Swiss-Prot record:
Required cofactor(s): Fe cation
Domain of life of the native organism: Eukaryota
Species in which this protein is naturally found: Emericella nidulans (strain FGSC A4 / ATCC 38163 / CBS 112.46 / NRRL 194 / M139) (Aspergillus nidulans)
Gene: asqJ
Family: Belongs to the PhyH family.
Assembly with partners or alone: Homodimer.
InterPro entries named among the record's database cross-references: Phytyl_CoA_dOase-like
Protein name, entry field: Iron/alpha-ketoglutarate-dependent dioxygenase asqJ
Pathway(s) of this molecule: Secondary metabolite biosynthesis; Alkaloid biosynthesis; Mycotoxin biosynthesis
Keywords: Dioxygenase, Iron, Metal-binding, Oxidoreductase
Enzyme Commission code: 1.14.11.81
């Protein structure tokens, strides 16, 4: 299977309708910001194939906005002047209130004519030892053949029925609705009871565990913070540039800039990732940035991938999903957010039927929170213990037991 067509300067994507809230997955409940027409005029599609403002620069959030000059009710924003008003963490881009905006501020944006470095591509088979050092250096790497095509096929088949009927993330029927994902996105997590490929192949992937061991050894055990299939419908809007974990774990904002990553994200292509259907934008090296005043879409490169390839990024790598511009293609991915077990997962596997859990390997059980955890502390006393004993010992938890299809049904039925 050949690689998707490269993204060139002749490719173009339509300008967004900034008159409505597109429900992006980062900005929460943003207001609408209008771009200066003069700014638009200065940046043609030819010189800026991704759009002068990153397509969704109009979405506003006073804390997480990763954009450059725009207007809010006629007031022009300038990131250099705004971000210098007060000390901020490495992730806080603007002051908490709009009172610090300087109406007279002006900033310019120039197209970069030099050839950009592309995302490093490594083989899951031949370059395993290079993957994490590469991500540490560049903030991202594409792992070719992270999952085999057979696993991709089976995983897609197993999750299909659930993706088709999943309500939108912000559905009123949910008591913890997600208002930061677009209404054209479907997300299905807690995959263990509904996908044999996930619970047997993905959770026991030697490639995944080698990378996680390399990344998290200074902290101790790690587990799945979320494993989810995301499907993005035709014409799905682009996301704003962002860093992960900022709408669930604000503690990461208070870590030292040089602290080792506490979580990483495998974005596994379950369908082709092309420039036209919204392949992820990444800013290489941005995981080391503290000054975010000049973040722009001009600095991004695209993660073009075949099914089974994975884009690996850290929780500080600036990235975003691109816009689907064909109007006909659906893009699907498996996002596996792995993190140290000192962080609370975004998903809960407590409702997974015990027969399903007992069919797993001990390693997979630990990843889903059905085993006690250990830190790298010299005198570690353990995490998730019961009066000094492990979960698995106290509950007499078995492992690698045969599983009949009907034993996974309770949660599956409830999910449907």
């Amino acid at each position: 299977m050949g690689y998707p067509k490269a993204f060139t300067s002749s490719d173009s994507e339509p300008e967004p309708d900034l008159s409505r809230d597109l429900g992006n997955p980062v900005m929460g409940n943003p207001g609408v910001v209008s771009r200066s027409s003069s700014t638009v005029a200065q940046h043609s599609v030819r010189n800026n194939p991704t759009g002068p403002d990153g397509r969704l620069a109009g979405l506003w959030n006073a804390r997480a906005l990763l954009r450059f000059p725009a207007e809010v009710n006629g007031v022009r924003l300038d990131f250099k002047s705004v971000s210098s008003r007060r000390p901020t963490s490495r992730l806080s881009l603007l002051p908490y209130s709009l009172c610090s905006i300087c109406p007279s501020s002006q900033a310019t944006m120039t197209s970069k004519d030099h050839v950009k470095s592309q995302i490093p591509r490594l083989s899951a088979i031949n370059d395993l030892h290079k993957i994490w050092p590469t991500v540490e250096e560049h903030g991202a790497a594409i792992i070719e053949s992270f999952l085999s095509l057979d696993i991709v096929r089976r995983l897609n088949e197993e999750v299909d029925p659930f993706v088709k009927i999943e309500p939108i993330p912000a559905a009123k029927t949910k008591d913890h609705p997600n208002h930061v994902l677009s209404t054209t996105t479907r997300l299905v997590n807690v995959l263990a009871p509904i996908s044999k490929a996930y619970r047997e192949d993905v959770l026991n992937s030697k490639v995944l565990h080698r990378i996680c061991s390399d990344a998290f050894h200074v902290y101790g055990d790690y587990w799945v913070l979320m494993g989810a299939v995301m499907e993005l419908a035709p014409s799905n809007p682009a996301q704003p540039l962002h860093r992960d974990m900022r709408f669930s774990h604000p503690i990461v904002e208070y870590l030292k800039p040089d602290a080792p990553a506490t979580s990483i994200n495998f974005l596994v292509a379950l369908s082709p990732f092309t420039a036209e259907n919204g392949a992820t934008h990444v800013i290489l090296g941005s995981h080391k940035w503290q000054n975010l005043s000049n973040v722009s879409m001009d600095a991004t490169v695209r993660a073009l991938m075949n099914p089974g390839d994975a884009l690996l990024i850290t929780d500080s790598t600036i990235h975003c999903g691109g816009a689907e511009t064909t109007g006909t293609e659906t893009r699907r991915l498996l996002t596996i957010t792995m993190g140290i077990s000192q962080l609370t997962p975004l998903e809960s596997n407590l409702a997974v039927p015990r027969p399903v859990i007992e069919s797993l390997t001990p390693l997979a059980q630990r990843l889903l929170g059905w085993a006690s955890q250990r830190s790298a502390a010299p005198r570690d006393i353990g995490l998730l213990t019961i009066r000094g004993n492990s979960i698995e010992k106290t509950m007499n938890l078995k492992a690698e037991q045969p599983l009949h299809d009907d034993e996974a049904e309770p949660l599956c039925r409830e999910t449907i």
